[in-house]
Regions:
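Short, solvent-exposed polar/charged micro-motifs at secondary-structure junctions
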Residues: 3-9, 89-94, 179-180
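Short, solvent-exposed coil/turn linker segments
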Residues: 14-19, 115, 121-124, 179-182, ...
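A short, structural micro-pattern
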Residues: 27-30, 84-86, 163, 197
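Short glycine-rich loop/turn motifs
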Residues: 32-34, 89, 200
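Internal, non-catalytic "lid/hinge" segments that mediate substrate recognition, gating
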Residues: 48-167, 171
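Terminal, contiguous helix-loop blocks that mediate binding/assembly
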Residues: 96, 126-137, 143, 154-220
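Generic structural motif
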Residues: 38-42, 95-97, 174
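Active-site nucleophile/metal-coordination loop of metallo-enzymes that catalyze phosphate/sulfate
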Residues: 1-73
Length: 220
């Protein structure tokens, strides 16, 4: 299900990238990348939760580093880069101009209990040809992430402790860098934003506001 009520040029991922200090250049596509927990049959799993049991930031950083080393790093014909965020909330950038944001992705928090097979990224009807390649690449990354994450020591420790594990990557909110005037350019005003949420801070960045960061704030 595409995000409802969100303008095509202002998708969550590119706004979060601005907050995280990750530059998105023209032609690149950014996506939110969740670490999610699965349940049920390995051949036909369902989403157990969208947050890997609210995995810690320290654990998640280890996992995303491993994912970028094995599956990303900006290498290959259809490159991807993975950037660690907070807890289960991370970012993927598809550089090189090959990708399209015209892909329907399902937000995991809206689809807890849903079958993975019914929710995988697909190109939009009548989308540009690059959309099909983008959707296929995202599906491939999801599939390849599962054995990699399953074998990681972080998940072994969580499994032994009876905690939900980070079983898969999950992509949503694809978009390109927006073009928007700052509040000063449009109205001649300045201001600041205080938030623990990257989405809100990213809006502040694009609006030209001072972003005030509070140490230890996570938004959880």
């Amino acid at each position: 299900t595409p995000e409802a009520g969100v303008h095509e040029n202002y998708k969550r991922a590119v706004l979060e990238a601005a907050s995280m200090g990750i530059p998105i250049v023209d032609g690149e596509v950014a996506l939110r990348c969740n670490l999610i927990s699965l349940e049920g049959d390995d051949d036909d799993p369902r989403i157990k939760n969208h947050s890997s049991g609210h995995i810690t930031t320290e654990e998640a950083r280890e996992l995303i580093a491993a994912v970028d080393q094995e599956l990303g790093g900006g290498r290959g014909e259809r490159p991807a880069r993975f950037h660690a965020g907070i807890s289960y909330r991370h970012l993927t950038v598809l550089p090189g101009g090959w990708a399209s944001p015209a892909v329907d992705c399902s937000p995991p928090h809206d689809n807890v209990g849903g079958r993975i097979a019914d929710l995988l990224p697909v190109a939009r009807v009548d989308a540009e040809p690059a959309a099909a390649a983008t959707a296929a690449r995202l599906r491939d990354l999801i599939a390849r992430s599962r054995p990699l994450l399953a074998a990681h020591p972080v998940n072994a420790a969580r499994r032994a402790a009876g905690q939900d594990t980070a079983d898969s990557l999950w992509f949503w909110s694809p978009g390109r860098r927006p073009s928007m005037p700052t509040l000063h350019e449009r109205f001649g005003i300045t201001g600041a934003v205080i938030s623990a949420v990257d989405l809100i801070r990213g809006l502040g960045v694009y609006a030209g506001l001072d972003v005030i960061r509070v140490e230890g704030a996570t938004g959880l």
